[in-house]
Amino acid sequence: GVNLGGLGFLTEIPLRNLYPAVTLMLEGRLEVETRLMLEAVVVRQGTETCRFLVLNDVVINKGALARIIDLDVFINDQFLTTFRADGLIVSTPTGSTAYNLSAGGPILYPTLSSFILTPICPFTLTNRPILLPESHVVSITLSRRGEERVSLTFDGQVGFDLFQGDRVLIQKAKEKLKLIKSPDQGYFEILREKLMWGGAPFNSRDEGQQRG
């Protein structure tokens, strides 16, 4: 993608390099990268109420009140745990540098065939992120919510209210996203530039003094 402004984590090609990049693409000299996507289904009282395709993450989050919620999580129909937390993030490798990273989850290399479950502010210190292969199916049931509102969001764009007993099924989608990679930057260079990863931020004056 071409970055027309903003952080542009997925749009690796700056606007100044648009025409050279188009030339390389037409010549078949640009690498195409395939990214995992997720499918999320909400089941209420045995009936499917919505289905969404997700590139970055599925997030279950409590409302404005400072109360935790209980989420029963099953992996391939086997009980994993009950997360007592502010919420839960299910993230793809593409989305691992977004909300997942802010919540203490790891960065996943974007072409990995896996996804990650990351609790948001868990009540129990032993509740930590867990990495799963793409073949696994995750089932999350809202077992307790009290009076507060609990929201389910898809890629931070679409919101959906969850009620006690609702079940969210998440699995690998049949669809894949194909991205054209920048010929000038690798993934780790993008991490350093966009997220200031692996070191303290510096400005051009600091860089000039170091070179001098």
Positions of PLM-derived features:
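Gly/Ser-rich helix-loop-strand patches that form or flank binding pockets
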Residues: 1-9
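A generic structural signal for short beta-strands and their flanking turns/coil linkers
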Residues: 34-38, 54-56, 67-71, 86-88, ...
